[in-house]
Regions:
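Regulatory nucleotide-sensing modules
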Residues: 1-42, 179-234
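Structural motif
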Residues: 36, 81-82, 222, 265-267, ...
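Cyclic-nucleotide recognition modules
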Residues: 49-106, 237-291, 299
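Amphipathic alpha-helical repeat elements characteristic of tetratricopeptide repeat
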Residues: 85, 130-134, 138, 196, ...
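Short, structured interface segments
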Residues: 94, 99-121, 163-183, 287-295
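TPR-adjacent "capping" and linker segments in tetratricopeptide-repeat scaffold/adaptor proteins
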Residues: 118-135, 188-189
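Phosphate-/nucleic-acid-contacting segments
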Residues: 132-179, 320, 326-414
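Short alpha-helical segments that sit at the start of domains
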Residues: 304-329
Length: 414
């Protein structure tokens, strides 16, 4: 019948491979109806929460299917299994008819993303600090030193709101009074019915470590997502109309992991927990977009985490460029050129290596004519050459790892 959701059941025998890491057959994902499935990765970058054996009601392949990127894991049948096969185009209809499935996917994705994001921060940004609401004062101090008074005023206000008797409360009040004459168009709170909001350029929507219970949909303008690490502002993303952000704080009732600042004048729709529950049942397209957004972020962070295990600096740089090409959906067999939207400094932040080490590796890559620096942006004269170099570096790393393992076994045998 037209309009009726039709899902197919598929069976796999014990030990059969269902999906294979790196493959691009990602149109479908699976929900386990009967049996058990083992999930594994070629490089186990971090221990998975919840283990790697899945059973009835669990799902897999959603990250790659909804992000339309290559598989980041291999799924193999532990027993004979019966699976429900869902095409990505059916997801909106599925969640419209089955709200619990939507919530399970979104909540699991949110927890997974936060877990992976914290692991990546430890490895690349070298930040391992536990959540601390008093960090709001440090955020305010940073922006005050940069004479960015709108951001500073907001963070001071939020610090006082949540830490009125904190160790730095007196200093925060004093600083707010000093910078108040230079601050306009800064609103630190909104009423329960103020869902459509306007923000002027450079004003803060929320600050890292601030409690949050709303996600935002950008309707006009742009918002940048930043984090203060080692007393520096690290740019994580610039989001534009149609993008969604702030979802993890809403879904998990945990502090914001980064700050959101208006990159230009912008208009956003704020969605609180009560509205979000209604949206799942009535706004399936928006929920599907949120799922796709989370899936895309998870895929990208997995790739970045795997990148941290590459020991050769040039190998790590080629790999991160390859990841960026796939993220931007550039065909790997393309002989065309491509200019990345970042330069050497941002590249060093991505791979978590010292700038001097990155510059040295880049010089060698430039000498080999694999890349160029054009207007302070990384430029690949031929995309396929980046892919070839990445594959070559990966093979060399595997050979070296095999040699180390052989030497270790030989020593143990002696």
């Amino acid at each position: 019948m037209p309009g009726q959701l039709q899902l197919s059941f598929v069976t796999f025998k014990k030990d059969a491979f269902i999906v294979v890491e790196g493959k691009n057959n990602v149109e479908r994902f699976f929900i386990i109806n009967q049996g058990k499935v083992r999930i594994s990765k070629e490089v186990q970058v971090v221990a998975e929460e919840g283990g790697n054996i899945l059973g009835p009601g669990d799902f897999f392949g959603v990250v790659s299917s909804m992000s339309s990127h290559s598989h980041i894991e291999t799924a193999r049948a532990v027993t004979d299994v019966v699976l429900i096969s869902v095409h990505r185009e059916q997801y909106s209809e599925l969640i419209q008819k089955n709200t619990p499935v939507a919530m399970k996917v979104i909540l699991q994705f949110s927890r997974r993303l936060r877990y992976l994001d914290e692991a990546l921060s430890r490895l690349t940004l070298k930040s391992s600090a536990l959540p601390d609401i008093s960090h709001l004062f440090n955020v305010a101090e940073y922006y005050a030193r940069q004479s960015q008074y709108k951001q500073a005023f907001y963070a001071y206000a939020k610090y006082l709101e949540h830490c009125p008797s904190g160790a730095n409360a007196g200093a925060a009040r004093e600083r707010m009074m000093k910078i108040a004459p230079y601050v306009t168009d800064v609103k630190t709170s909104f009423g329960p019915e103020e869902f459509n909001r306007m923000y002027r350029k450079d004003t803060m929507l929320f600050a890292e470590e601030e409690p949050g219970d709303e996600l935002f949909v950008i309707q006009k303008g742009a918002v940048k997502i930043v984090k203060i690490v080692d007393n520096k502002e690290v740019l994580l993303a610039v989001l534009k109309a149609g993008d969604i952000f702030g979802e993890m704080a809403l879904l998990e009732a945990k502090p914001r992991v980064a700050s959101a600042i208006a990159y230009e004048d912008c208009q956003v729709l704020a969605v609180n927990r009560a509205n979000f529950q209604r949206m799942i049942a009535t706004q399936s397209q928006l929920i599907a977009k949120l799922t796709t957004l989370l899936a895309d972020r998870i895929w990208f962070i997995y790739k970045q985490l795997a990148n941290t295990l590459i020991t050769d600096p040039a190998g790590r740089l080629y790999d991160i460029l390859c990841i960026q090409l796939e993220k931007n959906r550039i065909p790997f067999n393309s002989t065309a050129s491509f200019t990345f939207d970042f330069g050497p400094k941002e590249l060093a932040n991505m791979v978590g290596l010292p700038q001097a080490e990155v510059n040295s590796a880049l010089r060698k890559m430039i000498e080999k004519k694999k890349i160029q620096i054009v207007n302070n942006k990384v430029h690949a004269p031929m995309v396929i050459e980046i892919i070839k170099q990445t594959e070559s570096q990966r093979k060399m790393q595997k050979i070296e790892e095999a040699r180390k393992e052989y030497r270790a076994q030989t020593i143990i045998g002696l």
